[in-house]
From Swiss-Prot:
Gene name of the record: GapN
Annotated family: Belongs to the aldehyde dehydrogenase family.
Induction (record text): Induced by sugar addition.
Keywords: Cytoplasm, NADP, Oxidoreductase
GO cellular component entries: cytoplasm
Transition state stabilizer (site feature) positions: N7
Protein name: NADP-dependent glyceraldehyde-3-phosphate dehydrogenase
Active site: E102 (proton acceptor), C136 (nucleophile)
Catalytic reactions on record: D-glyceraldehyde 3-phosphate + NADP(+) + H2O = (2R)-3-phosphoglycerate + NADPH + 2 H(+)
Broad class of where this protein is predominantly found: cytoplasm
Originating species: Scenedesmus vacuolatus (Green alga)
EC code(s) of this entry: 1.2.1.9
Anything else known: Algae contain three forms of GAPDH: two cytosolic forms which participate in glycolysis and one chloroplastic form which participates in photosynthesis. These three forms are encoded by distinct genes.
Amino acid sequence: LAIPPFNYPVNLAVSKLAPALMAGNTVVLKPPSQGVVAGIHMIKCFQAAGLPAGTVNLVTGKGSEIGDFLTTHPAVNCISFTGGDTGIAISRKAGMVPLQMELGGKDACIVCSDADLDLAATHIIKGGFSYSGQRCTAVKVVLVMQDIADELVRKVHAGVQKLKVGRPEDNADITAVVSEGSANFIQGLVEDAKAKGATFLTDWKREGNLLWPVLLDNVTADMRIAWEEPFGP
């Protein structure tokens, strides 16, 4: 059973399918609810390429409705899942079935005193805000030596201010997050940080699912944003 995420619905699906097929298995692909069309077209490509019928099988639907049925089905003898907290629920219900999971994280960038700060700032911005931050490997926190912190903050802030916010078809750097639920979750993290005294280097702005990039300083360990994965800009 292969369950890829919405942000790379083809790339991460293939990375699950290929090893399984090479090892002689048949596979059930359950594409993400927000990436079903990509999964359907990929299966059509496999069929057009001559892959035997039944080798890769597609099941669509909301994970909340069909997830338990799939992950606990007796015919499933391995589960490969990429995502967030859902992986915990799958692992609890799957029993002794082998699991391969890539879940959430809080990826840090560490900047030492002798670093090239222009280079560091460039990669922090690229790592934090590409795909509007909707990547499991996105930079989510920067740990920097005190003696260079203020200068690095200025450089990162200047770069963030240049990011274009808007629609993908307009080549914007920051586009809408995947769902209203995701936007609401991110807003909750931001509001918690504000209530607990974080320094906002950018203004908080939201229009529907479109969130302007947020840059925070003086984040403390009691803030949710210090520990939870925002999966957004």
